[in-house]
C-alpha cells in the first residue's frame, strides 16, 4: 500500500515495508534515488515476549548489491553540542512506536534500501510488527 501526500515543499510517499509480521522478514527493495529524506517507523502491537531488531541495508548499484547501513539517525534527545545520534539498528522490545531516519548527508548515490526485521521470541510469541517508510522528494 502506498500513499502520496503533496505539501508545499515537495512530495511525501509512504510505503508499508512489513505489515503485521510475526517472524523475521526482509522487505522488498525500495527505490530512494533522488530523495531528500527517508523516515522509518517501527510499530509493535501486543508484544509480550518478543523483540524486534530492525536493520537497514542499502545499495548504490541499482539494487544488485546491498551493504549494512550504520548511519541511522536515532530519535534520541541530545543537546545541540552533542549532535545527532547515529546507530546501526533499532530495537523494539515492547508495544509502542520508534521513529528514525536515514542520515540525509549519505543519501547521494544510494539507489535502494531494504528493511530487515529480525524477531526473537522468549517464550510464547505474541504480537505483531509493522514497519513503514516515508520518502520526501
List each model region and its residues.
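Surface-exposed, low-hydrophobicity beta-strand/loop segments enriched in small/polar/acidic residues
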Residues: 2-137
Amino acid at each position: 500500500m502506498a500513499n502520496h501526500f503533496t505539501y508545499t515543499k515537495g512530495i511525501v510517499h509512504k510505503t508499508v515495508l512489513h505489515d503485521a509480521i510475526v517472524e523475521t522478514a526482509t522487505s522488498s527493495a525500495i527505490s530512494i534515488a533522488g530523495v531528500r529524506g527517508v523516515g522509518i517507523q517501527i510499530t509493535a502491537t501486543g508484544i509480550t515476549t518478543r523483540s524486534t531488531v530492525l536493520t537497514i541495508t542499502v545499495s548504490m548499484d541499482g539494487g544488485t548489491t546491498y551493504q549494512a547501513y550504520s548511519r541511522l539517525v536515532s530519535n534520541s534527545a541530545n543537546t545541540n553540542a552533542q549532535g545527532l545520534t547515529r546507530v546501526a539498528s533499532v530495537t523494539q522490545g515492547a508495544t509502542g512506536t520508534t521513529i528514525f531516519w536515514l542520515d540525509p548527508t549519505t543519501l547521494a548515490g544510494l539507489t535502494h534500501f531494504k528493511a530487515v526485521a529480525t524477531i526473537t521470541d522468549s517464550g510464547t510469541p505474541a504480537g505483531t510488527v509493522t514497519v513503514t517508510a516515508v520518502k520526501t522528494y
